[in-house]
Amino acid sequence: LRSTITFSENKGAYKGSLLTRLQSLCNGINGMIFVADEIPKEQLFEENVIVDLSRVGSSETKSLIMGMMVLKLQEYRMSSATGMNAELNHITVLEEAHNLLRRTSNEQSAEGSNLLGKSVEMLSNAIAEMRTYGEGFIIADQAPGLMDMSVIRNTNTKIILRLPDQADRELVGRAANLNEDQITELAKLPC
């Protein structure tokens, strides 16, 4: 930590903020995830498993945990692959996917690159690439307008339920190649 912080003006604030964030990942339910004994990868990625993050406090921590799990899944699939274009043998469901795959600006700030945008792009690419290893994904969300466009474009089958918001209807309707009348009907679907 000392060797990575080179600027002196905000060094104390930066260090304190970073240490506080790291400590929060080692307390309570987060501590059980990051510090306790690991579940074997085979059990986590080959069997039926539910990862319930409802008790994780902040959305940022949920996103971090979900992102790390998707990347670990990608590593596991790549290392255990017997070839390319494998048949579907496992499905991962990402519920409330906007927590992980949120639409971000492509703009770069004066401080440097868009870190959040790059991480969403990296995860979206990982999800797309895992199909060749037999991994399928169900991306579920009630607010498609919050999700990154690449996620919507890279899904083949779309199941659309009632969408009261016009912007969501337009977005999903265009992605599913619906006509104007069909897009209008999305607001009238039963709940």
Language-model features, listed with the residues they occupy:
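P-loop NTPase motor domains
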Residues: 1-128, 132-135
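Conserved ATP-driven motor cores of ASCE-family P-loop NTPases powering translocation/secretion/packaging/pilus
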Residues: 110-111, 118-191
